[in-house]
Amino acid sequence: MAEPQLKPFVTDGCSMMLDGLPDDSIRWSHCCVAHDKDSWLGGTETERRESDKRIGVCISEAAAPLLGDWVEGNVRWGGSPYWPTTYRWGYGWPFWNGLTPRGYKVLTEEEQAQAEVLIPAADALLEQEIGAAKKPVLENAADES
C-alpha cells in the first residue's frame, strides 16, 4: 500500500472564531496559525494535547486567560482526528487510512520525509503571521511616544 500524501500547509487562521478584536483584527491569529501547523501535520495524542495547551497559553497572553481557556477547550473537542473536518488533527493527510480514520499516529519515515519538504513553506507562513501580529503593537507604541 502506498504511503499517504501530505498536502501543502493551508490555514484559515482561527477556525470558527475571530482572529482578533474589532480594533486589532489579527491580535491572536498567530496563535491559531501555529496551532494549525501542528494540526496539519498531526501526530500522537500527547503531541495534540501539548499543541492544544500551547494555543490556550498563547491566546491567554495575547488577549485574556478566559479566552485562552475557552479556545483550548474548544480545540480539544472540535479538533479530534476522528471528525472529518478541514481543521481536524492531521488535516494535511487523507482522513481515511484504509477502512479507518487516520487518527493519532507517529509519522512513518516516509511521511516525515514528505513533511520535511513542506515544513519550510509552513514556517514561512507562520513567520509572516507573527510579524503581522506584532506590527500593530509596534505602531501603537510609536504613536504613544
Which residues does each PLM region occupy?
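Extended terminal accessory/targeting regions
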Residues: 1-145
